[in-house]
Amino acid sequence: MKSPKIQFEHPTQLAASTFLRAVSENDASAMWEKLSRETRGLLEGLYAARSAVALQHAAGVEPNGLDARLDEVVAPLRLSVVAALGGPDRVGGFGVSGARLVDRATAYVLLLPDFGEERIVTEGDWRPSHLLAFVYESREWLIDLGRTAELSSDAELPNPLGVTR
């Protein structure tokens, strides 16, 4: 496997920071806007199963804050992220690495724990870290649950999205 190209200024870095802030602040709308279509569909399906409603009634959740289902749909993901990153107090303590470009439609960033003062760190300083994967769709980089799990496993890193149930 070819090593991914590193890019130090990439839209995924801001997207990852925005997503982590949204998780920390329990901002369901901001979280939803950063998720890929596939991830949104998975969460809508999970919501439909939990709520015992037909899938067509669970689909099409709007991120505008007016959709009453939004909080319930993203709650399992938020709980998983908070648990995987070590609790609500630790979620805001992660930095974001430069982006690694796997291919034209896939990139990831590492979520790095707080090191204190700024410095060059070794792999031993940041492992185990977490990897957050993005797919490029509709002209933006969006977090993808499946790619995050797959790439985290390949890198032998814990999945920051946890086990969403």
Please describe what each predicted stretch is.
Residues 1-25, 29-49, 57:
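Short, low-complexity N-terminal intrinsically disordered segments enriched in polar/charged residues
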Residues 2-7, 51-123:
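Surface-exposed, charged secondary-structure patches
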Residues 9-10, 36, 63-67, 139:
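Short, structured coil/loop segments at alpha-helix boundaries
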Residues 102-165:
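Low-complexity, intrinsically disordered terminal/linker segments enriched in charged
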